[in-house]
């Protein structure tokens, strides 16, 4: 054996980084394995996503309205949620489970749990930023940041700099009466869980964000407690903090096999075989995002997680663009200001591991930004990105012990909420590894809910 740790964490994205940080902060001897040459690699779901911290997102992806809307979108290549037709038993299983999760009684039972996870994680984000990280610009929950600031994501944690996040809300704008009416109905349900939501008229939208230029905007919804940050900077800062607390970070370590059974772990995982050697551990955490099912199949687990391709485009941020994230509601296009960059992002595309860039998708992002806030739909692009979000059928993550391996903990399947739920996932995974009762009841997040 080349290495032995209390815990080995597989995956150097935001979830793996947060789990490693939480374990190292507790004094565990933890090793993080990342298959690429650096943590938070460009292929990861967090590298260039929209950087949203959204405690307001309490409605899971699978909800009653999603089924009807999804059926209209599924085979439309330009829709926000597209399923590429293909012969796949895994996809068929995922769609069947998604259908069941959209049942009203199921969705209603999931929303309070997602709200609790989001609220606790938002508080942990504040705590992490207060101790050696970047400031929460805007003065904390419920305060607006009126200025452009000095930019998000300023390096690692050297010199007390760290990342920055802005807690100044998220503004949705709608261009149709039907879109606004649906948003108002959703706002009522969200308020019932204690989330602050404001419905705005077209005039109020322009008062809050004068940069919104489209005459077609009929109104909007503001979630004032949401925020944004550079997701890659945050992830790397968590890894740097874990290293400072003694964690070992091993890159270029692709896991290709497991050694199981025997020893102190019983019917568990004794070691992981990787391209950088063999790593033994008392416990293993799988936090590999969309790659998790591939790893777990080696152990007989078939998690229904689909790699949902998302896109983003970085352009130079024009003067006068909004200081808070904006979502063009009907198009589901998000515009996030990140310092001198404006990131345009959207879409869920279930195309298996086909990660090709589709020009139609990219053009749709630019058209929406041009129409609503006047961002030129042609011109220089700083970066074009796509990456796989780990999408579960019910929109909830998988957190808890493996149903088949006593010393393996799963922390994956966060869909589009990895950045938001990273800190709470780190805490919960660390509690499970320590044999403690989790501080939040995560029974509903167990992998065996999918019959694995």
Model regions and ranges:
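Glycine-rich FAD pyrophosphate-binding loop
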Residues: 25-47
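Active-site substrate-recognition segment that forms the wall
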Residues: 49-52, 57, 61-102, 257-260, ...
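A conserved short coil-to-beta-strand element within the FAD-binding core of flavoproteins
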Residues: 200-204, 208-209, 251-270
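C-terminal lid/capping helical subdomain adjacent to the catalytic/cofactor pocket in oxidative enzymes
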Residues: 5, 199, 396-398, 402-452
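N-terminal Rossmann-like FAD-binding beta1-loop-alpha1 element of flavoenzymes
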Residues: 5-32
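Rossmann-like flavin
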Residues: 92-240
